[in-house]
Regions:
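Glycine- and acidic-residue-biased ligand/ion/polar-headgroup-sensing regions
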Residues: 72-91
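Bacterial N-terminal signal peptides that target proteins for export
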Residues: 2-13
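Histidine-centered metal-chelating micro-motifs
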Residues: 64-67, 103-115
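Ligand-binding loop in jelly-roll beta-barrel domains
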Residues: 109-131
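C-terminal motif of bacterial Sec signal peptides marking the signal peptidase cleavage site
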Residues: 21-24
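A short glycine-rich, His/Asp/Glu-containing loop-to-beta-strand
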Residues: 38-68, 74-77, 127
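Short acidic-glycine-tyrosine-enriched beta hairpin
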Residues: 91-109
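Bacterial Sec signal peptide processing site at the extreme N-terminus
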Residues: 26-37
Length: 132
């Protein structure tokens, strides 16, 4: 071949284009955090406090209301008003009776969706530390 360097450059261009194409055909999904996620286009959570160290959200779920698919960073939760919630995540669907006054914490949630399938409004406080 008269121009061997051209063959190498062409191979790099084709390979590079192929890699870029593959990435654009299957982009990683970006999910909202709990504050940005809503239900039927309306907010579910409100920010009560935010500073350099933490953020505190109050999330309210009337009967039949829910929270569209979202992720959570590490957080602590406190249940002000409990209820019966249907939770969908990568493990499937489960129904949980959440008592008022209970609490929970975890290192984060890849994704989940929740729906209040009970008869009363459920209210949660979510405390998210920053910088962890």
């Amino acid at each position: 071949m008269a121009f061997p360097y051209l063959k190498n450059r062409l191979a790099v261009l084709i390979l590079g284009a192929g890699i870029g194409w593959m990435g654009s055909c299957s982009p990683a999904p970006t999910l909202p955090d709990p504050l940005m996620a809503g239900w039927n286009g309306k907010p579910v959570c409100e920010c009560l406090h935010e500073d350099e160290q933490l953020r505190v959200l109050r999330c309210t779920f009337p009967p039949g209301g829910g929270h569209d698919r979202h992720f959570h960073a590490a957080h602590y939760g406190y249940v002000i008003e409990g209820g019966r919630m249907q939770i969908t995540d990568k493990n499937g669907v489960r129904i949980v009776d959440v008592p008022s006054g209970s609490s929970f914490n975890n290192d984060g949630v890849e994704w989940h969706e929740v729906v209040n399938i009970g008869d009363t409004t459920s209210v949660y406080l979510i405390v998210e530390p920053k910088g962890n």
